Amino acid sequence: QWGEVWVVAGDARQRRRQIQVVMNAIRAGTRFEFCYSESSTMPTTLTEPHHLPTHPLEDFAFLTRLRRHGIPVGLFYRDVYWKFPLYGEGVPKAKQLVAQAMYRYDLLAYRQCLDVLFLPSLRMGEWVDVGDRVKKVALPPGHDIDETPTATPPSPLSMFYVGGLGSLYDLRAFCEAVASVPEASLTICTRPKEWEQARKDYEPLMGNNIKVVHANGKKELEPYFAAANVAVLAMAPHEYRDFAAPLKLFEYIGNGKPIIATEGTFVGDVVTRDELGWTVQASVNEFAALLEQLTQHPERVDEACDRVMAARDQHTWAARVEELVTALAAVDQR
């Protein structure tokens, strides 16, 4: 339904060949509606297998040439993790400085070669300086869950969290609150390595109503989603969380689960704005009070679930494509 898509991908040599094919087609009269690109998690110049900047201009020059032919160019900029002290953890200082310099080079290049910079949230735009000409547009993640989720009874309160447990994923206050409400239960799904690193901090806070499991991929996660009636993104606030748009938020929505979130985070703002669950302060007392309410009033879980189900289609990947098409059409001056 999106028409014909031409792909420029692969290593530098493969991209060079594909770029030539595209430019020849443009000269022959082919009309391209727009160009959409996505940044790597690495700096663009370091994405070759050897991680050396052997082709520092090629990709940016291609995007600039497309703009000169009047083709709107948009790029999704994935993350600014590199601007935070946490980026340096486990990375040799020299490599860290080189990578950060190359990330800054990317931002300078975007000033010349883009019309639209797509970001997971507009708040992230405060950390990304690409000049005034380039338009910043929010394009959060989506979900690809086509099947209608099976309804889960609202009682007993059964919660599910899937994700990391590192410094950006601090769930300790929430775990302590869950342990104080025996009528509720929480299942944490995380990687074995992350659990081994975190268990000394978490186990003293956990009661018998919290269990840790390890599953990977949609199929393995299905039974845990099916058993839960509420999903959890109740991490302690962090400057990075102010704008971070985790994929898990939209995976939870796709699975039809209302969400417990924390104030002072992007997730909390979305949950509050769209009435997709509950947003509270990140404290043991606040979490415990909410859990007591939900165990005593399961109808509130049912009502929140209905609202999430009503919003599911607004947060699919297909809906995101419609959004980016609209944004790029708006800057087309042909």
What are these regions (language model features)?
Residues 149-169, 175-179, 186-190:
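Conserved donor-binding/catalytic core segment of Leloir-type glycosyltransferases
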